[in-house]
């Protein structure tokens, strides 16, 4: 319903601790979003980025390893260009959504893909001088030590 979509875009969500490669739960103050008349939805194809509403009316954004079908109501879909931002948002950070047209989404995607394709040209190897590395001891430079003089029983 339109009223639920308007409420959704006006709500400030918090990235929950619950999240993995399957999806990210979002928390917010107040009552859950109404799924009136939508809880009898047959299972259908799910897209990465779909925003499902749980039985309690809480949003859950589906990520790269989400299920392929589902029957929960969905209020929208996060565009592919924004999914990396959402997936990497630390727990406790505020998130908000806005509805955009298909044309706007396609323009954002085109710009996103252009930036990704230009990365190869812009990226340079990082060469660091160990003398100037203040965090050198933080690196695991060896994974174990053995003695060349030890017998197989001692090592």
Predicted regions and their residues:
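Conserved "landmark" site that anchors the functional core of diverse proteins
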Residues: 1-155
